[in-house]
């Protein structure tokens, strides 16, 4: 099949029409990874790139947003003490991923506070707050706010989580940060619930996320 591949290179937009061409070779010869956002494309199966909105303007995400029923990809993130944290550390538990752009925004901060309150009464469930904020910011916020029922984690070092779960914003004012989303992983290690919040400035649906672990 034919695939349009769009790459944002500085201020130019390059549109490539794939007719069984070796696009990987084209990328290596003509495109620097440091000067563009590269959208991964599966040439065997159609890959649908998810989108969200920021203040009403469409924002593309890199990769494919994680789907219900799939085995949750493992990931490595950074804790407030700068040590590594992996999903496999939580085997046998329900896991709620509260994913957001930055704690420096009111909506993101509110989501952490609310999940912290809700997390206090959940059995066999761990809530993770994930963003690109530095661990120092996570530590400062959680200490100041008295956050005890949420584990704050940063994706600043490894940057494998954002691609595996399809939540990195590819364009717009917040390009490079994580989109607002909630993902629930069941005790069996499979994705039980997802919400890609359609508008970055809005809060997620907390009740539906909690219902997925009860």
Tell where the protein language model's regions lie, with residue ranges.
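Short, contiguous, well-ordered secondary-structure segments
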Residues: 1-4, 188-190
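N-terminal targeting signals for export/organelle localization
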Residues: 2-7, 13, 17-18, 22, ...
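Chalcogenol-based redox active-site neighborhoods
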Residues: 48-214
